[in-house]
């Protein structure tokens, strides 16, 4: 199930805020979530939305903190809810400025999966050629290759 809001930001840009997105346990890992996101990206680009936004949650039944950046959502390190995790990131990845900087390598993804935390206001940039779109395309290609 999912809930979304269509909004306009302070600069007059249209965006979609994804409030919630939950899948049943039997649906996770099937590719359904990435397919739903791919469809939302295509629809939003066609309707001239500037970006998608969500709070990428971490909890007993929530893995958005990892899944959404893996598929292209990004945020500055200051958007990580936990100050102690922000400090650990700066120590482990001193060159990193955003969550996607951490997620750019397998080592970073592995570290984030264990140590990562809730991200406030993560954004998926819908502009052609954006890092979000490039990351999403690479993720989808990796899924196809894995089978």
State each model region's role.
Residues 2-4, 12-26:
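Conserved acetyl-CoA binding element of GNAT-fold acetyltransferases
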Residues 21, 35-39, 53-55:
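General structural concept
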Residues 24-28, 32, 54-60:
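Conserved aromatic-histidine-acidic binding/catalytic patches
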Residues 28-44:
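Conserved acetyl-CoA-binding loop-helix of GNAT-fold acetyltransferases
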Residues 79-147:
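Intrinsically disordered, low-complexity, charge-dense segments enriched in Lys/Arg
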Residues 42-60, 67:
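Conserved GNAT acetyl-CoA-binding A-motif
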Residues 57-80:
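Conserved active-site alpha-helix within GNAT-family acetyltransferase domains
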């Amino acid at each position: 199930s999912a809930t979304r809001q269509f909004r306009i930001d302070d600069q007059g840009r249209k965006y979609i805020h994804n409030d919630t997105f939950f899948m049943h346990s039997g649906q996770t890992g099937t590719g359904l979530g990435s397919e739903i996101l791919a469809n939302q990206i295509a629809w939003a680009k066609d309707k001239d939305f500037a970006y998608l936004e969500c709070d990428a949650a971490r909890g007993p039944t929530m893995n958005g903190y990892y899944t959404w950046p893996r598929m292209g959502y990004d945020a500055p390190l200051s958007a990580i809810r936990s100050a102690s995790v922000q400090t650990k990131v700066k120590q482990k990845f001193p060159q990193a400025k955003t969550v996607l900087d951490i997620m750019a390598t397998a080592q970073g993804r592995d570290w984030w999966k264990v140590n990562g935390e809730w991200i406030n206001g993560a954004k998926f940039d819908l502009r052609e050629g954006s890092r979000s779109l490039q990351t999403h395309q690479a993720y989808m290609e990796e899924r196809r290759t894995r089978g």
